Amino acid sequence: MKSGEKDYSVKEAMIFSQRIAQLSKALWKCVEKDWQMWIKPYDLNINEHHILTIAYHLKGASISEIAKFGVMHVSTAFNFSKKLEERGYLVFSKKEDDKRNTYIEITDKGEELLLRLMEEYDPENNSVFNGALALRNFYGKFPENIELIAILRNIYGQDFIDIFEKSLEDIEENFTESDQKLVKK
C-alpha cells in the first residue's frame, strides 16, 4: 500500500458509520426511555442522575471530570450540578492548591437518594436488559461489548474506559442482592 492510501473503501466506511449511527440511535431511544422511567419518581433527569453516579463512584470530582466522564459539555455539568447542590445532593468546593477548578462531592442526602434508586432498579422494566436476556440464556452470559468498548477507548481515551470499568467494579464489590434488590454491603 502506498503512503497516503487508505486500506478501506469509502463505501465500507459509509456502511459501517451508518450501521453504528442507526444502531446507536435505536439503542439510545430505549436506554433513554428506560432511564427516565427509572429516575422519574425521584424528580431527577438523566444528566442529574449521571452526575450523582459519577460523583459517587469517583468519591468527588472536578466539574471537568464530570463533563468528560458524563459525556456532556462543561456548562451542562456545572448547571446540573448547581441544581443538585440547591437540592442538597452535592456540595461544591475549591482546593487550596487548585483554585481554578470547581470540585463536587456527593452529600449523605445525595448518596441516600442514589442508593435508594439502585435498590429500586427493576430489570423487568429495562427493555435493553430484556432484549439481551435471550443472548444470556443462549450463551450463559451477557454480551461484553468489547468491540464497542474498543471504539469508545479510541474516541474518549483509556481514562474514560477506566472510570467506566471502576464504576462497574464498585457495584460488583460494594453491593449485594437481598430480596431481589441491590443494596450496599
Swiss-Prot record:
Gene: hpr
A biological process term (GO) from this entry: sporulation resulting in formation of a cellular spore
Role according to the record: Negative regulator of protease production and sporulation.
HTH marR-type domain sequence ranges: 13-157
Listed Pfam families: MarR
Subunit structure, as described in the record: Homodimer.
Keyword hit for Membrane: no
Family matches, as Gene3D superfamilies: Winged helix-like DNA-binding domain superfamily/Winged helix DNA-binding domain
GO MF term (any one): DNA binding
Name of the protein in question: HTH-type transcriptional regulator Hpr
DNA-binding region, residues: 63-86
Domain of life: Bacteria
Signal peptide: none
Chain ranges passing through the membrane: none
Keywords of this entry: DNA-binding, Repressor, Sporulation, Transcription, Transcription regulation
Organism, as annotated: Bacillus anthracis
